[in-house]
């Protein structure tokens, strides 16, 4: 068997280019927020698998998984993996490459014959206590009341599958398939609001399996407590992607109704622990000028880094809709900031004579509903 684990990064990339194979369908059990199954977080989900109606075995052995596995066994791309295929055609690093590197230490020859779950990637429905301005009812239950009053959200439907993690039995069934697991990935909604999440962790601790398991969370941080930190000490590694989209009143507007003093309290809880914390920031026209303050916080608390993503929806919040005056100001301000993704984003900003009038309209709608004042907080969208 080829020892992929011993390959250097460049050699691994070369191997991936020569071999159309991904280990993810053989080791990874992944769900969507709205109650569907998928091969990984980048694949197309199967509409034939409803998490409210299936158990782990019936999903793992479903033809959706088997068809993908057979495609990879035959050095072919499955239909559900078009995103990785497209990225690699442009020589952009894909999820397939990440998964193959992550699981290079396993016996792939054996897994090709007998797939075994080593990772549960669980998006635990849409239960959430915040209603961020770039979110929707699909990812937050607290958005339900507001979305009926806002024009661009009227097309969203509240689907039964969004409640799968609360009403279904799948999370209870997971403990019957967890003995080999090395990684648990929790996202939401807000995953720490789900009580069954604690049940799974305590089961692993009681069975003395936790020291072999790493945990990853996408979290808004509001629910983190000393009890969680004590619980996490029993695991091999814990990584938090802690969402923060600005500082002080900017974050409070974006991640409504969060209080920034509470965010700093959670930062102090996590400071000087062995938990890996990365700040997760979604950049848009509204918060781009505040990004340097997030990097300052990361350094102040000695966190592991800042993950920069880009707001795609609603479209009016995209960076390209800033005025040219602000774009020029950003290019100058961020010239020396040491973050390649951010540098690439700023360099790619085109001067297009845009006007953020739709963004101004959206924020005005939010202000009426939430009794806020965006003009005081984001004056640059009027410059």
Locate predicted features.
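Distinct, well-ordered alpha-helical segments
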Residues: 196-202, 225-232, 290-294
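Eukaryote-biased activation of long, low-complexity terminal tails and linkers
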Residues: 154-169, 182-184, 200-204, 211, ...
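Core AdoMet radical
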Residues: 117-127, 138-166, 179-195, 207-226, ...
């Amino acid at each position: 068997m080829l020892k992929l684990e011993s390959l250097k990064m460049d050699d691994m990339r070369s191997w991936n280019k020569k071999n159309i194979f991904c280990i993810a369908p053989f080791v990874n059990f992944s769900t969507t927020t709205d109650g569907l199954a998928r091969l990984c977080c980048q694949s197309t989900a199967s509409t034939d698998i409803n998490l409210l109606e299936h158990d782990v075995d019936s999903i793992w052995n479903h033809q959706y998984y088997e068809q993908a596995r057979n495609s990879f066994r035959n050095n072919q791309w499955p239909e559900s993996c078009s995103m990785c295929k497209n990225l690699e055609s442009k020589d952009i690093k894909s999820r397939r490459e990440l998964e193959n590197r992550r699981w290079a230490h396993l016996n792939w020859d054996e897994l090709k014959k007998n797939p075994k779950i080593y990772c549960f990637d669980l998006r635990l429905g849409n239960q959430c206590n915040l209603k961020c301005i770039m979110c929707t009812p699909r990812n937050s239950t607290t958005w339900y009341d507001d979305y009926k009053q806002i024009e661009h959200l009227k097309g969203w439907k509240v689907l039964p599958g969004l409640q799968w993690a609360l009403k279904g039995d799948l999370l209870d069934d997971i403990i019957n398939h967890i003995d080999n697991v090395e990684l648990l990935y929790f996202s939401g909604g807000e995953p720490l609001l789900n009580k069954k999440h604690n049940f799974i962790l305590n089961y692993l601790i009681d069975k003395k399996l936790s020291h072999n398991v790493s945990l990853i969370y996408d979290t808004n941080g509001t629910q983190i407590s000393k009890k969680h930190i004590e619980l996490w000490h029993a695991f091999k590694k814990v990584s938090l992607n802690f969402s923060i989209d600005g500082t002080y009143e900017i974050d409070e507007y974006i991640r409504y109704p969060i209080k920034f003093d509470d965010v700093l309290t959670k930062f102090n809880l996590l400071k000087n622990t062995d938990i890996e914390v990365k700040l997760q920031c979604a950049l848009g026209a509204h918060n781009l000028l505040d990004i340097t303050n997030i990097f300052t916080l990361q350094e102040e608390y000695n966190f592991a880094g800042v993950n920069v993503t880009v707001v795609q929806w609603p479209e009016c919040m995209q960076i390209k809709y800033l005025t040219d005056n602000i774009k020029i100001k950003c290019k100058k301000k961020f010239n020396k900031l040491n973050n390649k993704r951010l540098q690439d984003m700023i360099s790619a900003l085109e001067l297009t004579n845009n006007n953020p009038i739709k963004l101004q309209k959206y924020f005005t709608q939010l202000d009426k509903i939430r009794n806020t004042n965006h003009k005081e907080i984001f004056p640059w969208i009027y410059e």
